[in-house]
Amino acid sequence: MKRMIALDGAQGEGGGQILRSALSLSMITGQPFTITGIRAGRAKPGLLRQHLTAVKAAAEICRATVEGAELGSQRLVFRPGTVRGGDYRFAIGSAGSCTLVLQTVLPALWFADGPSRVEVSGGTDNPSAPPADFIRRVLEPLLAKIGVHQQTTLLRHGFYPAGGGVVATEVSPVASFNSLQLGERGNIVQMRGEVLLAGVPRHVAEREIATLAASFSLHEQAVHSLPRDQGPGNTVSLEVESENITERFFVVGEKRVSAEVVAAQLVKEVKRYLASPAAVGEYLADQLVLPMALAGTGEFTVAHPSCHLLTNIAVVERFLPVRFGLIETDGVTRVSIE
């Protein structure tokens, strides 16, 4: 019997990433774990609907036995079984993030006995989670370089707080992992601004695009008007395509916040990324830790290692026989497998 790994949910940033990473790694390695203090660092601690959906999805895919899988629970025991490929559907029942549920279960399906399709309904444009377009246009091309073949499709948008969105991913077992080397971003090739609207006046998008264009030379500007029943909602994105990597940044519009202020938040975030020669943005860095650890090799550079990133690394090192090295030089941190 494999040893039970004990995790403290309050460590590091004290959020849901500890649980999601632990679920992924437990499914992959077959190691059971117990976690206490789930989301202890949040205003509303314990399992919310999206976290509970991730737990139940993981349990279904690997036929795990679980204790503590209920709303508000701050303690969970997870004993995994064998990961099985198949056609899975999960409903969050709120505007909780579809992509964070997918992020939990997809890595395990890289090791399944056959191809899989996973469909999740809930929120797709959530201020605290990567949207589906980030997964499709930024993460999945990098995963392909590592040897992971998965394809995410956004079937219907679901804005916070209403939800109602649907995201599906098709994934195949990985034959072998490759090393990802992202030391340098390279020169910028082009920048693209994009606005999504649902039940929001078009002039909002025009003002947001104008704010982006005042700070950056945009090679493309796009406004996509969605059916009103998918809203109300508004998301502004800016994609930076460089020689070695494409990064995408986004801000979700809020009620009583002007279009100019929303877009200015995005401008600030992109300028912070471009001010450093680091290849990877803060949020993408979190997503690369697990696949890089599974490959057992690779490196990337990031301007500042976030608490989220450091917490994720700590959890990965509990489950896998790898060690990460972080070396800071001239304001850039190089993250690599030692």
Swiss-Prot record:
Name recorded for this polypeptide: RNA 3'-terminal phosphate cyclase
MF term (GO), any: ATP binding
HAMAP family, sorted: RTC (MF_00200)
Gene Ontology annotations for the cellular component aspect, listed alphabetically: cytoplasm
Chain's gene name: rtcA
One BP term from GO: RNA processing
Family: Belongs to the RNA 3'-terminal cyclase family. Type 1 subfamily.
Pfam family, one: RTC_insert
Catalytic residues identified in the record: H308
Reactions accelerated catalytically: a 3'-end 3'-phospho-ribonucleotide-RNA + ATP = a 3'-end 2',3'-cyclophospho-ribonucleotide-RNA + AMP + diphosphate
